[in-house]
Amino acid sequence: MHFHTHLLYNTCEKYCLGAVFFYFWGVFLYNSLHKCKGFSFHVLLSLTEILKGCLATMNKELWIERANDSLVKHFYEQQSDIEQREGFESKLTFGTAGIRGKFGLGEGRLNKFTIEKLALGLARYLNAQTNNPTIVIHYDIRHLSAEFAQIIANVLANHQITVYLPDTYKTTPELSFAVRNHNTTSGIMITASHNPKDYNGIKVYGSDGAQLSTDASELVSRYIEDVGDPLQIDIPISKQNTSYIKPFPKSVTDDYMKHIQNMIGYIPKSDLQVVFTSLHGTSVPIVPKLLKSLNFNQFNLVEAQCKPDPNFSSVQSANPEDHRAFDQAVELAHKNDADLLICTDPDADRLGIAVRDVHGQITYFNGNQIGALLLNYRIQQTSQLRHRLMIQSIVSSDLTKSLARYNNVEYKEVLTGFKFIAHEIRQLDDYQNMIFAFEESYGFLSDPFVRDKDAVQIVPLIIKYASELKLYGKTLKDELEQIYQTVGRHEDTLFSHTLEGLEGKKKINAIMTKFRSNPPQEIQGLKVKAIEDYLTSEVYQLDKDTTSQINSPKSNVIRVLFDEGFIALRPSGTEPKIKLYVSLKCPNFDDVAQKINAMIFS
């Protein structure tokens, strides 16, 4: 019984008078339970929930009183009752990818107060890590990105942390480069990538330009939680402290472009025509400026989509994985007889491509196919190097691994999340040459002067590749077919299942438990060779009946290996979703993949 009394006290402690009242109310209930035989444990729990509801109402009222100062009153007023309630009944958590969420009131939403809380926790973390910390802050074109950047800068400056803040939006890869180039302690990118317009987020980077490691993220999270109630934060702004906020040197952007120019060298002259769209994001003006500096002018912008717009007004989807993101680019390509279509997501860390043939037929490429093409080109470009290495995520295609093996290129597989790729790059020996890294979710890196996905450096690289092919009367589609002929037609697909509520959570857990406790001998006629469990860091070889260790951080992922490829199951840590990845080299791939999906989720 003491636990529930203590729970009441903890729930109420931020409101002192309420805490005292509810604490003694809990004591009263506790005594009543002992003295009154008819007074049940369930009554106590019910009353506890009622009191928690009262507290939630008090909490909501306090937030509404501060709505005018929150920066998000407009967003809150546009939300449904359920969405509003979620903001008060949940809490934003700082995870391995930082924080991402909707605008609104409450600790479960992004607003002035929750941003101040995050910034204060981060300031304490940085000051605990080193003397005189420095940081670069970049932000994208989303609603409140610039305002959040200024709030964070003010809080950090108030704690004597030197902040470099640009006067305009920037791309995510530029942030990674800036941290490394300017030798700062940390970096912050304010973005929500391709999420809807009412989302934003904050990603934190370490001194190597990579997103924080799991351990560092957990430590930052504890510092943020220790701040307490965001409505109680008082951040005095003084002229002396704001002197810690410095203008971001424009020379850093110039250096970033020079690195890409040196990587590309030149783009061969051909009659290749390109259509490019930034999907209202940050890659314009830097990408057009970069292409022109490389003397490539044969491109047309989707003008309506190349203007920064936090509402993403002219796109159905700002996600390069979604073919709808290309709709206006396709129209322009038909009009101009273009060969290659390229789009980047709003923070320019991911990229999608499509090609148009002489008959006007559009072919879209998935992330694994783009990865295979880029790896193939990098293998051609680096033939003079020894000890070449390619890095990819564990759910990316076997196609690229086969291509690497065929060309005597070493490969490594890491957990999903580009910070794990960055970690591998950091661990490289001097003699190793990392020539390419990617994730199937359309994130690519050719040269590791950046330690995150970088669509900006990939745009001129893919154009150079396509331009070379055009000189020989070939296309990227032809080149992919040649890769298939060389190493086999590995094909890939992804099934994403949303399973809401308690029953959905039970089903997800049951699926994962079944594969762990009773692994199948075969799936749709494919003989299972091994089961890799990244939660236990073990791999079970079915044919040998042996278990060995996986040298990897823990993650709730299961991968089933066949001679023909693999399938992988990966539940989301933040949403009621589970993803099934299928990567196989077999006849009737689409039919087999659909049957595997039906078997697992029926």
Please give the residue ranges for each predicted region.
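An N-terminal, well-structured beta->alpha segment
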Residues: 60-152, 159, 245-272, 282
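Gly/Ser/Thr-enriched, mixed-charge loops and adjacent short helices
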Residues: 83-92, 200-327, 332-333
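N-terminal amphipathic/hydrophobic targeting modules at extreme N-termini
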Residues: 10, 14-15, 20-21, 31-33, ...
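Conserved phosphate/anionic-ligand binding catalytic regions in large, soluble enzymes, centered on
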Residues: 90-108, 278-286, 438-443, 448-456, ...
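Phosphate-binding and adjacent anionic-ligand microenvironments
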Residues: 334, 338-340, 361, 381, ...
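N-terminal small/polar loop signature for handling phosphorylated ligands or for N-terminal nucleophile
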Residues: 136-199, 296-352
